[in-house]
Amino acid sequence: MKRTRYLLLLLFFCSGFLFVDCHNKLSANKFKDVELAHVLPADSLPPSDPLRDKMDTLEKYANLVGERLNGTFIIARHDTIWVERAYGYLELFKDPTGYGNVTYNDLAARKREESNKITLSTLFDLASVSKQFTAAAVLKLCADEKLKLTDSLYRFYPDIPYKNVTIKQLLTHTSGIPEYFNFDFGVYDTTMFITNEQLMHVLAVQKFPVIFRRGAQFKYVNTNYAILAAIVAKVSEMPFEEYVRENLWKPAGMKDTRFFTEIVGLYPSEKSKDYPLVEKSLEYVDVTPVEEYAGKVARGHWRNAALAPYDRLNSILGDKGVYSNVEDMVKWTNAFFINAEILPREWVDKAIKCQNILSNGKTPAEMYGYGVRMEEKPEHGKVIFHGGLWDGFHNVWLYRPSDGLQIIFLSNYYNRAHTGRCDQLLDIIDL
């Protein structure tokens, strides 16, 4: 039965029917040196090695995915890379306005620019995949006894109306606090990129009502993680960016990963700088990465391939705002989740356990831990994962605790090119 299914999958892939819908100076503390291993080509593996046939199929799959994927993807187990690919371009169409007027001649011109090609080291906005770093920072403070999961928001921000909401409820999206994406843009100071500090001020002044009683429901809301980033900065007495870099990224050996605020030169200063607008919009800003990151950072694109300008909300961190590449994400997964090098194992286990149990004792259909989602798949076991969508970026990060398998897609073109592909890869690997 498994052999038949294997042949059907291979036939499916081969048929072509694949609608795959610091700017600042680093401190004296050095990044850990981490080298990732690469698996040998399939034809060099012994015929008796069960990985040989799978590698051949994975290679074919990778080539077909590349027909539509604008981005990178990687398949790894522990610190060994099985397959990794980079496809497409940093920018498709330069013009962020006049979306109806872009032509494929423009795209062809961009394709001829060698410096415009995506590589495996290209940095992508992780969007909500960033949340696992915020959760890890919170858990690190808990492990260091500087914070408790039962601490209330009132302890840190007494002027904010959600005073009885706990750290755990923020981590698990059970706080009832409303989504800041939905606030009227007029509540912000729109002469600048909007920061976590400004968001906290807006919450204190506007006193928006809760959308449900804390603990009563699970609703994925980005405000929770933006608040957590502000709390990390306050408790650690360090900028959020610095705390994460020193305590998470350096021990993991993530030398390339940065925050949006570093990419565009907002960190550690210039946060009050006036920025030009796109089409007189309060929301979008006409700004590009600083020279240090030119040619290293992908720009997001909407479904019509038009360039997505930077949003003023980009500089709110915690819920998003991390830029990374596939190999740095493998280093992170190994250091934090697999080897427990960043936090004691007990805290890592808490992060990947379902934690969003409601006050009535019920578990929502969507299981959420600390910064990650989880699902029990009948054929593949428990997988830990998170997606990310933001201003033209579309990402998926998946990790399986039972064998250290990792599947990561990072894309800067929201054409759904890798939707559902993790399940197909798991089918190949588990046959």
Task: Describe the function of each predicted region.
Residues H38-D43, Y89, T150-D159, D184-D189, ...:
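Short linear capping/connector segments at secondary-structure termini
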Residues T80, Y99-D106, N164-V383:
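Short, surface-exposed loop or secondary-structure junction motifs
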